[in-house]
Amino acid sequence: LTNKRMIYVCNVDESSASSGNKYSKIVEEYALSKNMKVIKISANIESQISQLDDDERNEYIDSLGLKEPGLNILINEGYGALDLSTYFTSGPKETRAWTIKKNTLAPASAGKIHTDFEKGFIRAETINYNELIEFNDYQKAKDAGKVRLEGKEYEVQDGDIMNFRFNN
């Protein structure tokens, strides 16, 4: 247990959400001495922003001097502490996020969807989310040569969008 990475989460009031308070500073000092992460989060703010649409949420977060909601920070830090990453699959009807361990090979990642995908894995059409956003269209990105064919030894990267080719 002592070798596990830990994250300390301090629930603070709204006015302390960006800079913390005297109690969160004590926790920060301790955590830093142990090389651990500290996240300050206001449950009250998180509750309020859960009721807002995206534009209102962003405006409210900015008005508080925060970069992003505390819950987003907690999720990202949690993924990091657990060595997890996310890849996506997308089709005409749905886009789905899949959680995997970092450095998972493409066939094992495909196996998260269905074991037949792992057994019959051939290749994966792959583009990173940030590259796709530049083109705003999968076909345009593919035409520009940004979609890669990756094989069995490819380590899936956080934010990859993948279309698996496999034999049944």
Tell me the role of every PLM-derived stretch.
Residues 1-157, 167-168:
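C-terminal-of-GTPase-core extension/linker across diverse P-loop GTPases
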